[in-house]
Regions:
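Charge-rich, low-complexity N-terminal segments
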Residues: 1-90
């Protein structure tokens, strides 16, 4: 499968750089915490993803990002252009 992932953050704008968080930092965290574990892998073999539905993938990503990305507000995972799931840490 090929998934598209959207990461959303919420917070106050930093007066030093006018960002809530620099997208380069988000990208770096995503690549280190998520991408290297999922890219070109058989998802069923990954701990916690024995049933890799978009719902479960979004929760798995949330759980692996939240400690590194405390401003995380949503993780959306799409399979194709039209169908996906958004997890908000509920």
């Amino acid at each position: 499968h090929t998934f598209n992932v959207i990461i959303k953050i919420e917070g106050s704008i930093n007066s030093n750089n006018d960002f809530v968080m620099d997208f380069f930092d988000i990208d770096d965290i995503f690549n280190k915490s998520i991408f290297k574990h999922l890219d070109h892998k058989f998802l069923n073999d990954i701990e916690g993803l024995s049933s890799p539905t978009t719902e479960n993938v979004s929760i798995w990503i949330w759980n692996h990002l939240i400690n590194e990305l405390p401003l995380l507000s949503e993780v959306s995972v799409f399979e194709g252009e039209l169908y996906g799931c958004t997890y908000k840490g509920d």
